Each structure stands twice: as structure tokens, then as C-alpha cells.
Amino acid sequence: MGKKYLTISNNLCINCVKPLSAKNEKIKKGLMQQHTEENVEQQIAELTAQVEALTASAGVTNTNFAEAYYYLSIPLMLIIHAGFLAYEMGASRAKNVLSSGVKNILAFAFMIPTFYFFGWWVYWGFPTGLTLSEGPMGISGAAYASSIAWGWGDSAAFMGPNITDQASGVFFGAFAMFAATTASIMSGAVIERIQTVGFVILAIVLGSFAWVVAAAWGWHADGWLVTQWGVHDFGAAGLVHAVAGFFALGVLMHLGPRIGKFNADGSANHIAGHNMPLTITGLMLIIVGFWGFLMACVIIPGEAWSWFADKQSTIYGTPITLSSLAFNILMAIAGGIIGAWIWTKDPFWMMSGALAGIISTASGLDIYYPALAFIIAVSAGVILKPAATWLENRGIDDAVGAVTVHGTIGLYGVIMLGVFGWGYPALAIENAPVITLYGQIVGAVVFFLLGFVPGYVCAYILKALGMLRVPAAVEEAGLDTVKVPAQGYPEGIAPSGPASS
């Protein structure tokens, strides 16, 4: 009985073990699956956190790089002013050398506060025209400008110390240097006879208003010249150089030539500067500084300002690389020098040809193939001196050729892009207008008017008020003798020899 019971019990136990084992296995598998799913979810959460951390780190890196990039462009552009300083002082006669230098330094000094107080606001307020309304991209108009570009009120955080803002100061700084460069272009044309106060007023009008309106219209994603006409001017050939050059022309028409420049029959006399090597050195410094100018025309990924999250672009949002920019700038400099040397053999115009090469290709440096940039620059170097002679034959005394180098060649560069860049998107948006010859001509005309009209009108007013030109006796004696309480060469001998009258 006991044995049978044991047998039956054993049989029952054996029969029970199988279903129990299967059930346990199922439970075990379920637990393992649940554990695996939990591990996967945990791993996904950890990976997501790592990706977010890396993305945030990359964003900080991009922002820091962009901040450093524009910060570096500011002192590089300041080299332009060192160049203009040497350029104008060398082109002046010894009796006017310090006056020319002081004037150029004052142009820079007055640009910074005036651009801070109203020039920056003009850039963001005026893109759609004189209506001060918001444009299609939503980054323009009076309300928007007041929110980010006013030195007080709601936008004060963008225009002053703010530890969380790594964009506003360096971006403003780069644009302020564009403004100062624009004013300095006009400075050289009027040396040796303009009143300092009158010059400062003209510099403020040009650097903190006239060119800024041109930039708002043609160098802004909401600019009406861009959105309606497809105007493209990457390196500011028109909106900086042409505006400044033709502003200078308007001023020169009222300022008049230096005493002794023209004879009674209208023929011109050459008035040599006191130090050609200094002038040539200044031109080379300007060329060095323009690397900073053009690098600041590139939009680097960063907070608030970039079109793309991961790559640089033009101010229009179209793609560009620093590599392509380097190719084209170098070819343009070389082409301009070669073209001017072939035509003139004159060291002054040869170095001016380097500037002409950069300016003539500036509008399309983001588009041109290097060989094309070289050809355009050579042609600009060739036409440089004949264009200056044509202007001189009409009674305009431009002491350094600023109207020709910046004005004429600036418009030439804008129009050349219409010829060679036709069909290329002008703006990085859907249904964007394309670059056309007629669009670029419209832009060129607008840039001419934005320069010439304010220059002509302001000079007319200053002349009527007796604030434009120094008296003839002061001019003949030398501005350093009468207007500046110092002399560049107190021994009376300039490096190149006796000062000429």
C-alpha cells in the first residue's frame, strides 16, 4: 500500500513537474523580455540625453566660433583705416599731412557712436523702403528695429552688456566698421581744402545713414531691391564702394579743386603727394584689411543670425565657403594689379588696381569661378586710369581717385554680376528672384542715387553756410600751419624732399 502510494505519488509529481517547468520557463522568458525592454528604453534615454548634450555642445561651439570670427574681423577691418591714414597722408603735400590724418581718424571716431545711436536702427528699420514696415522674412520694420537695435528701452539687452548674448555686439561691431570704411572712402577725395567740421558732418551722413539705407535695401533678406529685383551684392561693391564714391563726387562738385590744380584753359596740373612710398604702403594695408571686410560678409552659424544651422552662407542665405572666397580674392587682387600695370606702369595706379580688382569682383565673389574673377579684375585695372582722366578733364579734382576706384568700379562690379551671374538665385527662399542684368542695373542706379544725391545736397548746404571749404589763404599756407597745432615735419623737409606748394 505504501509502495503503491509512493508510485502514484511519484507519478503525480512527475506529471506535475512538466507543466510547472513550462510555466516557469514562460514566466522566466517574460521577465527576461521585460528586463530587455527596460534596458533598451534606458539605453535609448541615455543615448537621447547624450545626443542632446552633444547638440547643445555643438551649438555652444558654433556660437563661440561665430563670436570669435566676427570679433576677429573688427581689428582686421581697422587695418583698412590704418591704410587709409597712410594713403591719404602720403598723397597730401607736406604742409597738409597731419590735417589729412586727423580728418581720417575723426571719421572713424564719429562713426561708432552715430552708428550705435541711429545707424544700426536704420539698417533694421528701412529694408522695405521708406514705409518702415515689416518685410516677408519678419526681420525688419520700425517695431523690429526698436526691439533689437535701440540703445535703450526694451532692446537695451541687445545693445549693451548681456552675458547670455554672444551675437549682438560682434555683429554690430562688424557693421560699424563697414560704416567707418564707407566714410573713409570719401575722406581721401577731399584732402587739402575741406573744413574739418564740414567733413565730419558729411562723414556722419554718409557712414551712418546713406550707405546704411543702401545696405537695408540691397544687403538684407527683407530688402526690397533683393526681394523684388533680385539684386545681389555679396561684397558690397555697390552699397559701400559705389555709394561712397558717388557721395564724394557730389561733395567735390561744390568743394571745387585745390588751388593750382587747373589752369585758365581748363588743363590739369599734377599735384604730387609728398611721400609715394607711404601712399603705396597704405594701399597695401587697405588690401590686407579687406580680407577682414570680406570675411565679415559671410554669415557663420550661430545664435539668432544664421540662415543655416550647420554651414556658412552669404547675407542672402545662399551658400559660400571661405575656400572659394580665398581663391577669388587672390585672383582679383592679382588681376587688378596686372591690368593697371599693363595700362599705366604707374606704381600709384598699379596698387589702386589691386583695390579695383577686389571691388570689381566683390558682388559675385560667392559665385564666380576664379578664372572669371581674374578676367573681370584685369578689365577693371585697365579702365581705372582712363576713367579717372575722363573725370579730371571735366574739372573734378579727386586727389586719390576715390570716385573712380570706388564709385565707377563699384558700379562696374554690380553690373558685371548681372552679366555673368544671370539665373543664379539671389536669395535662399522658395520662389526667390534670380540675378538678372536688368535687376543689377536697377540696383546700380539706386546705389548711385543714394550716394550722389545726399553728398550733393549736404555739400550745397554746408557751402551756403560757409562750412565746406577753408579760406584760400589757409589753403595756400597749409592746413597744418593754420588748422592743426602741430607739424608733420617741423624741420620743413619731407622724406621725399622740400614740400611743394
Segments predicted by a language model, with ranges:
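Short, positively charged and aromatic/hydrophobic N-terminal segments
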Residues: 7, 11-28
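Hydrophobic alpha-helical transmembrane bundles of multi-pass membrane proteins
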Residues: 33-501
